Amino acid sequence: MKTEDIRICVIGLGYVGLPLARLFSTKFPTVGFDMNQARVDALMSGHDATMEVDDTLLQEAISQNGFICTTDMEQIRSCNFYVVAVPTPVDRNNHPDLTPLLGASRTVGQVISRGDVVVYESTVYPGVTEEECLPVVEQVSGLKYNADFFAGYSPRAHQSRL
């Protein structure tokens, strides 16, 4: 994949995903995807209620960089570099709830194409990416990991106000 061809989708526009997507938008065409329509509407109006991204920076990303936020999977289909940044909560027994992560993997599986890359930014225990997430992407997409698409894991190094 050539640098000039990169089109990024960040799945999950929370305290990790939104700052990351905003920063990516300064260099690459970037789409932020979230399941929460009210959150997407607020972001597209230039306001981040969580205050992770300064409203001025968000408005600049939208107006000058073409950054968009959406709940529409058709708008992320043309992307070729997917970053999954969804929460990984724990239950009362401190067991991780992979539901959001597996849902995001299904979303990626519905839109990923040959040659694309998916990077997992969510905090998970060792083995989750290859043993839990990528099989979902393979099953939904019909593509094969490391043959048709590629993946990585980025341990989170959160820097607020990017």
Listing of model-derived features with the role each one plays in the protein:
Residues P29, G66-I68, K144, F150:
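Conserved beta-strand segments of alpha/beta enzyme cores
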Residues S160-L162:
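Short, intrinsically disordered, charge-balanced linker/junction segments flanking boundaries
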Residues S25, R77, I112-S113:
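Short conserved AdoMet
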Residues Y82-V84, Y120:
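Redox-cofactor binding/interface segments in oxidoreductases and associated redox assembly factors
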Residues H47-F67:
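N-terminal glycine-rich dinucleotide-binding loop that anchors FAD/FMN and/or NAD(P) in oxidoreductases
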Residues M1-H47:
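NAD(P)+-binding Rossmann beta1-loop-alpha1 motif at the extreme N-terminus of oxidoreductases
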Residues M1, S63-C79:
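Short acidic low-complexity segments
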Residues V90-A157:
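Rossmann-like NAD(P)(H) cofactor-binding subdomain of soluble oxidoreductases
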